[in-house]
Amino acid sequence: RSAQGMGKMERLLASYRGALEPSTPLGDLSGSLGHPVE
């Protein structure tokens, strides 16, 4: 996979997770990038 493609997917997952958990701090969302989102 290309690094760019992975970055897009990570941002997508972070946005999706943020939508599910609106109370999650932005710092936590940023920290979750680069790690598997369960």
UniProtKB/Swiss-Prot annotation:
Segments carrying the region annotation (Disordered) are: 18-38
- Please indicate if the UniProt record lists Nucleus as a keyword: no
Which InterPro entries does UniProt cross-reference here?
Crust_neurhormone_H
**GO CC terms:** extracellular region
- Where does the chain cross the membrane? none
Q: Which UniProt keywords apply?
A: Hormone, Neuropeptide, Secreted
Expression tissues: Produced by the medulla terminalis X-organ in the eyestalks and transported to the sinus gland where it is stored and released.
Q: Report the subcellular localization.
A: Secreted
Matching entries from Pfam families are given as:
Crust_neuro_H
Q: Which domain of life is it from?
A: Eukaryota
Q: Which GO terms describe its biological process?
A: neuropeptide signaling pathway
Which GO molecular-function terms appear in the entry?
hormone activity
Please state what the protein is called: CHH precursor-related peptide
> Could you tell me which species this protein originates from?
Cancer pagurus (Rock crab)
